[in-house]
Every structure is written in C-alpha cells, then in structure tokens.
From Swiss-Prot:
This is Probable endonuclease 4. GO terms for biological process: base-excision repair. Keywords: DNA damage, DNA repair, Endonuclease, Hydrolase, Metal-binding, Nuclease, Zinc. Zn(2+) 1 binds at residues 71, 111, 148. InterPro entries: AP_endonuc_2, AP_endonuc_F2_Zn_BS, Xyl_isomerase-like_sf, Xyl_isomerase-like_TIM-brl. Zn(2+) 3 binds at residues 185, 230, 232. Zn(2+) 2 binds at residues 148, 182, 217, 262. Binds 3 Zn(2+) ions. Belongs to the AP endonuclease 2 family. GO terms for molecular function: deoxyribonuclease IV (phage-T4-induced) activity; DNA binding; DNA-(apurinic or apyrimidinic site) endonuclease activity; phosphoric diester hydrolase activity; zinc ion binding.
Length: 292
C-alpha cells in the first residue's frame, strides 16, 4: 500500500487537529509536522496542541500513527563545537522528542548538523555523543531520530550515506536511530537517481539497510546532480523528473515507508493535493503550476 502525504503546517488555534484535517483534505494517508516554527525554538505547551482531537480524527480516517512524522527545527546543530550551544541543542531535542511522543509520533527527522570550523569526523563524533545524551535523557521513550540525507551545502554532514551510517555505528542505542532519504538532497549530493537508480538503491541497502529507513522525502530538484544547492522543485518540474520519482515512490524496497512531499508552494498556495493525485494516478500534469 502507498503511504503518501506532505509537510503540513501546525497553526493556532487548531494546532495538531488542524494539521490532521489538512492532510486528510489533501487525500493523504501520511503527514509530517514541526512542533512549532522550523526557524526557531519557540514552542506552545503540549496541552494546547489539541492532540486528543487530532488523534480521534486520524483514527476515524484510517490515518495510521506509524505514518505520522515529526521534524526538528533547522537551526539545531548537534555538531557545533561550542559546548554551550550544543548543550542547548541537546536539551531542546530531548524536549522535542517528549512533545512528539505525546502526539503519538514515533519518528522525528533531524538534519544531522554542520561541522563549521572543525572537520567531518569531529562533527560525526559530536553528533553521536549528543544523540547518546539525548537518548539517555529520554530513555523512557521509544521515539526514533531519523537522520536525513543532506545536499552538501557548506559544512553539512550527511551528504554521503557513509556519514549517516558512521553516526549510527557510534551511537549506543542504535534502535532509536533511523534514516530519512530526501530525493532532492541525494541528487544534489551527487547520487544520480535519474541515471543510476537501482545501483543507488542497492547502495542504500548495503550502507544504511532498508530496515533502517523510516521516512522518504519526495522532492524534485531545481538544480543538476552534484550541485550541492538543496533547492526543491515541484514533482516532475525539476531535474530528477516525474518518472524517476514514481519509480522511487513505488519501489518494492520502500513499500511500507511513509513518503512525504516538501515541494514549494505555487503562488503562495499548497500544491500537495494535486501532487498527491498525480502520484496516485501516475499521471503527470504539465499544467499544475497554472492551477494556482
């Protein structure tokens, strides 16, 4: 069965209840939310999120809890060599895991971090150490952190599959570390999904293990392979292309994994209902952008 949805906003006054209702209106049976704005660490109290109401609506619409995905804010950097800033990140992510657990979300996607003025290996080590501390603080939880593949901008860690696996290898509680594949990021990092898809999928299995992939972000790319730009494009309008993305979405290796669209708004409007329909029908609509 296809589990497909998109990022959905969580806004007051309806909060998580509104997110679930929005996803259902898109024809989705999966979704991803931030517990607040992705650009900051300001968060509402958990009791204000309308969790009970949200979960009832999800249940009534056959939206499985296993297909609900959380995402940590972009500004968190577990590879930061500054001890004070890293300590803040550890505390905040521990609180985020508590919030998502209260929302019955069992996986939180995380951009691994930027090594800044150190080096990749030092960054990888700091991320693993930080994850150990986070899991120790939240040992009563089972919520996973899903490390995302990155495009390789600046000093990002995660542009190579091996870097993500190194982090998991170093972490003590490996059951709480999984992986999020982002199609745009993989392509921009140099994995040519269009020309070498099956070879790359086999690499994913041999390096990360299919069983450790918990989320897939489905995005086209505005830029060529190996550009390290990380600029998402609407499905079928970028350099990866509709047919290649369909092959990934429907690939037998990923059949049980929730796929999440993070494509850009068109004229400030969400395209997700239409993109989900294109994917379900396997029929690309070249006029999509003219609908808004």
């Amino acid at each position: 069965m296809l589990f497909l949805g998109s990022h959905v906003a969580m806004k007051k006054p309806h909060n998580f209840q509104g997110s679930i209702q929005t996803a259902i209106s898109y024809g989705a049976n999966a979704l991803m939310v931030y517990s607040g704005a992705p650009q900051n660490t300001i968060r509402s109290k958990t009791e204000e999120l309308k969790i009970k109401e949200a979960l009832k609506i999800a249940q009534n619409n056959n939206l499985s809890l296993n297909n609900l995905v959380g995402h940590a804010p972009y500004i968190i950097n577990l590879a930061n060599p500054d001890k004070t800033k890293r300590a803040f990140a550890i505390d905040f992510l521990s609180q985020e895991l508590e919030r998502f657990a209260a929302m019955k979300i069992n996986k939180m996607v995380l951009h691994p971090g930027n090594y800044l003025k150190t080096n990749p290996q030092e960054g990888i080590s700091l991320i693993a150490q930080s994850l150990d501390l986070i899991f120790a603080k939240t040992k009563h939880l089972k919520t996973q952190i899903s490390l995302e593949t990155m495009a390789g901008k600046g000093t990002e860690i995660g542009k190579r599959l091996e870097e993500l696996q190194q982090i998991r290898t170093l972490v003590k509680n490996k059951t709480r570390v999984s992986f999020c594949l982002d199609t745009c990021h993989l392509f921009d990092a140099g994995y040519d999904l269009k020309e070498n898809l099956e070879e790359i999928i086999q690499k994913i299995d041999s390096i990360l293990g299919f069983q450790n992939v918990s989320v897939i972000h489905i995005n086209d790319s505005k830029n060529e392979c190996n550009s390290h730009k990380d600029r998402h494009e609407n499905i079928g309008f970028g350099k990866i292309g509709f047919e290649t993305l369909l092959k990934i979405i429907y690939h037998r290796a990923f059949v049980c994994i929730p796929k999440i669209l993070e494509t850009p708004y068109i004229n400030e409007k969400e395209p997700y209902k239409h993109e989900i329909e294109m994917i379900k029908t396997k029929n690309f609509n070249p006029e999509l952008k003219n609908l808004f």
